[in-house]
From Swiss-Prot:
GO cellular component: cytosolic small ribosomal subunit
An example Gene Ontology biological process: translation
Biased composition annotated in UniProt, kind: Acidic residues: 117-130
Superkingdom field: Bacteria
Organism: Pectobacterium atrosepticum (strain SCRI 1043 / ATCC BAA-672)
Protein name in the entry: Small ribosomal subunit protein bS6
Length: 130
């Protein structure tokens, strides 16, 4: 089986349907004896340029190892699902399991925010003791 990186963008009005779509697509892959190495839901993001007069979309990234039949079925599902506005399937040489730069940046921002909040709590606690 080959390794693939799959990114698809969902219409922003259909964002609440994304978990069901992810479940359906992962079931397609695992049903064909494929494995999912990485699954990231990036959420709603600004598009670089308008697509069908839309300026935002809900992004999902999958890194999978699957047979060609499963990938063909996924591409067909993307094509006939009106909620999916764009999709891209790329073959990669090996499985990618580490977090993408998008998720790493989000985690770093969250850690900085938590550190700042803790530092603020320490300062407030120190002021009240005096």
């Amino acid at each position: 089986m080959r390794h693939y990186e799959i990114v698809f963008m969902v219409h922003p009005d259909q964002s609440e349907q994304v978990p069901g779509m992810i479940e359906r697509y992962t079931a397609t892959i695992t049903g064909a004896q494929g494995t999912i190495h990485r699954l990231e839901d990036w959420g709603r993001r600004q598009l670089a340029y308008p697509i069908n007069k839309l300026h935002k979309a809900h992004y999902v990234l999958l890194n999978v190892e699957a047979p060609q039949e499963a990938i063909d079925e996924l591409e067909t599902n993307f094509r006939f699902n009106d909620a999916v506005i764009r999709s891209m399937v790329m073959r990669v040489k090996h499985a990618v399991t580490e977090a993408s730069p998008m998720v790493k940046a989000k985690d770093e921002r969250r850690e900085r925010r938590e550190d700042f909040a803790e530092a603020g709590d320490d300062v407030e606690a120190g002021d009240s003791e005096e």
